[in-house]
Amino acid sequence: MTIETLRVELGERSYDIRVGSAIIGTIGAVCRDAVAGRRVAVVTNTTVGPLYADGVVDSLTAAGFTVLRIDIPDGEEHKTSVTLTSVYDELIKGGLTRDSLLVALGGGVVGDLAGYAAATYLRGVPFVQVPTTLLAQVDSSVGGKTGINHPLGKNLIGAFHQPRAVLIDVDTLATLPQREYLGGLAEVIKYGVVLDGKFFAFLEQNVSALLGRDRQTLVRAITRCCALKAWVVEQDERETGLRAVLNYGHTFGHAVEALTGYTAVLHGEAVAIGMVRAAVLAEARGHSSAGDTRRIRALVEALGLPTELPSFDADSYRDVLLRDKKARDRGLDFVLNRGIGGHEIVRIENLSEVFGICGVGE
């Protein structure tokens, strides 16, 4: 299978995204091109490590690197300052210097936490993303957002720190649990809804192939998602404008995650719920049609994702939403779809109106 290569153009911080099958063994060559130093720390977790870390370490060693492996616990509940400190401890004891490299091997939690460690250790060291979940491959591994959660909210502590490269091997999706795989499809849908109507139609036409994890279909879908993400990041790296569109579905999504303790509902499942709420809100405010909302809901359901908000009272949702990064002095910014393939960011002051439209607290 051909390797698809995309370029994220950010001046001196530009980097390549490589997407393909059976390419994880090229990580040594990728890292050799990325840094002058020859010490690497591979940050992975206790689930991904036994599956792929040995091959990554072997490739890095063959490329001339001295490799330190750091395994962290698996799960969103471990994306914390406690886990981050344990990574710092290993980097310090391992003698990594400013020209050393971190490799993030895993899903979004590993990528976000290892990326934040790279952004802050010795005031910044380079890192490479090797995402092994669909959600991380199409979203969190590209664009330089790194961070950890706080007990009062998700991703409240973080930094922008671009990777030196992103290496996406679709073969790693073969070992991904079904629920996590389906959660990743929510982020795939997101790109079609707010950025590319033709891509949304492609997803509608390829539901069976996506559910069957067809490699060719996945390479095509992941490559398109990464191309769209790169286009957005190139124009708005620090999320001062356009990049906020990538938060479609995340306003209610983050609230669902927080209210369920970051464990009962996966991130992708929460985003799926949030996208359907955003579509309902967009229709009510005249930005899209009932037919658009039906198509969005139908695709979410066809790909095995939830659509209904968990039953918490309106005050609970209000408290969490007002701690959201998208909250402003006067209201909350909602990313709404304009039809399918377009978007609009709307500031809404009256959350009671939103709750009534979206069925919050019912």
From Swiss-Prot:
Record-listed E.C. numbers: 4.2.3.4
Record keyword Cytoplasm present: yes
Obligatory cofactor(s): Co(2+); Zn(2+); NAD(+)
Reaction(s) this enzyme catalyzes, per UniProt: 7-phospho-2-dehydro-3-deoxy-D-arabino-heptonate = 3-dehydroquinate + phosphate
Key words, A-Z: Amino-acid biosynthesis, Aromatic amino acid biosynthesis, Cobalt, Cytoplasm, Lyase, Metal-binding, NAD, Nucleotide-binding, Zinc
InterPro entries per UniProt: Dehydroquinate_synthase (IPR050071), DHQ_synth_AroB (IPR016037), DHQ_synth_fam (IPR030963), DHQS/DOIS_N (IPR030960), DHQS_C (IPR056179)
Record bears the keyword ATP-binding: no
Gene Ontology MF terms in the entry: 3-dehydroquinate synthase activity; metal ion binding; nucleotide binding
GO BP terms, alphabetized: amino acid biosynthetic process; aromatic amino acid family biosynthetic process; chorismate biosynthetic process
Binding-site residues, NAD(+): 74-79, 108-112, 132-133, 145, 154, 172-175
Residues that coordinate or bind Zn(2+): E187, H250, H267
Annotated CDD domains: DHQS
Record-level GO cellular component terms: cytoplasm
Protein location: Cytoplasm
Top-level enzyme category: lyase
Gene3D superfamilies in the cross-refs: 3.40.50.1970, Dehydroquinate synthase-like - alpha domain
Cofactor note: Binds 1 divalent metal cation per subunit. Can use either Co(2+) or Zn(2+).
Pathway the protein acts in: Metabolic intermediate biosynthesis; chorismate biosynthesis; chorismate from D-erythrose 4-phosphate and phosphoenolpyruvate: step 2/7
Protein family (similarity comment): Belongs to the sugar phosphate cyclases superfamily. Dehydroquinate synthase family.
Protein name: 3-dehydroquinate synthase
